[in-house]
Each structure stands twice: as structure tokens, then as C-alpha cells.
A protein has these predicted regions:
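A conserved beta-strand element that flanks and buttresses the S-adenosyl-L-methionine
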Residues: 48
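A short glycine-rich, Lys/Arg-flanked "PGG" loop and its adjoining helix->strand segment in the class I
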Residues: 63-79
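Short strand-turn motif at the edge of the Rossmann-like AdoMet-binding core
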Residues: 5, 83-85
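Local beta-strand N-terminus motif with an aromatic residue
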Residues: 44-45
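Adenosine-cofactor binding site in Rossmann-like domains, unifying the SAM/SAH pocket
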Residues: 9-40
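Short N-terminal helix/helix-N-cap motif within the alpha/beta-hydrolase-1
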Residues: 57-61
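Class I SAM-dependent methyltransferase "Motif I" SAM/SAH-binding loop
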Residues: 3-9
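Short catalytic micro-motifs in class I SAM-dependent methyltransferases
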Residues: 51-55
Length: 85
């Protein structure tokens, strides 16, 4: 499964588009600072976080939780794309 985390208005065809807000036609509404994420362990083959990570983790526990969840949902050969400014 390919997942576009924190997609906002950038809806991608063929991907599961997740955002915190139900403003755009996303597939899943979920706060990325709330654990666990709504995906099975090892179920994601590609994860995209485009200008999202810098908005997460007001403290170290939350940031570490985000990283742990990304690791948990990634398949063994997953690709993780993180773009930050």
C-alpha cells in the first residue's frame, strides 16, 4: 500500500491519502500525533510525507512516536520519502 501522510490538498491517485482535517476528499482522517496509525504493521510499501514532518513533534516523545509509527507500518523493503524545507 502506498500512503500519502499529511496530504492536505495534494491528493494522489493510487495512494491512500491521509490528513488531520476532513477538508479535502481524503481517504483517511487521522492526527499523525495520535498513535497508533490506522495501518497494519508492515503494510506500507511507500510512504510520502511532503512538508509534514516539520509540523509534528512539539516535544521529543511525540516526535519519537512518529518515527516509531513510520517504522512499524513500513514493509521490510518500503520506501519512505520525507521532504522538509
Amino acid at each position: 500500500m502506498k500512503v500519502n501522510l499529511g496530504c492536505g490538498s495534494k491528493i494522489l491517485q493510487g495512494w491512500v491519502n491521509l490528513d488531520k482535517y476532513d477538508v479535502y476528499p481524503v481517504d483517511v482522517v487521522h492526527d499523525l500525533e495520535t498513535f497508533p496509525y490506522p495501518f497494519e504493521t508492515g503494510s506500507c510499501t511507500e510512504i510520502l510525507m511532503n512538508h509534514v514532518l516539520e509540523h509534528l513533534g512539539a516535544d521529543a516523545d511525540i516526535f519519537n512516536g512518529v518515527v516509531k509509527e513510520l517504522h512499524r507500518i513500513c514493509a521490510n523493503d518500503a520506501r519512505l520519502y520525507i521532504n522538509v524545507p
